[in-house]
Amino acid sequence: LGKEKIQYSYSSDTRDVAGVPNALYNCVCSFEHTVQLQAQTRLADFISDVDADIKRDLQPQSKRRRMTEQMGWVYKVNQQKAPLRIKQRVFQMGEYIGGTISDFWLSYLGNPLLPATQELQKYTKDFNVWVPPDGGSMGVEASSLNGIITLCIENKAEMPGLAGMIRTAFEKEDITVLEAVDLDT
């Protein structure tokens, strides 16, 4: 990767811990972590730590604490003496201004590795366009439908041949790749 460390981030639906599980509005908190890399680091070397971080962060107490931290930031922005259009722009910048800048994002609702569920199908339909935060070099959206995991990756650095490189990396980890395609947007 040409880096000594990478940051990864993910967001979680917090409607359950806020006591409004059926609310029709967006209620999320975002987490970020850093992984130190060595010259020959492989995904298998650190994925169990990533999994442990995610499981710990998705506990109700952690989600409430992070949601409170983020709401405090929103309140501070709202208290600024600035025109509404400036405040709206700050809100639109979201996690970038909030300090959650990452090399890649894990984005999902529930468990992306479960078989197709109505909730997951609705999520992928509602959020079929996903843009990584400004400052991120690439963004990753992962979903699972009928046992097939789909990764949509936006390569903001516009590095040619990324699909082929990703295929090679996955196959080195013994992961079958059905298709890897560079799409123009």
Set out the residue ranges of the language-model regions.
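Acyl-thioester-dependent acyl-group transfer interface
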Residues: 2-185
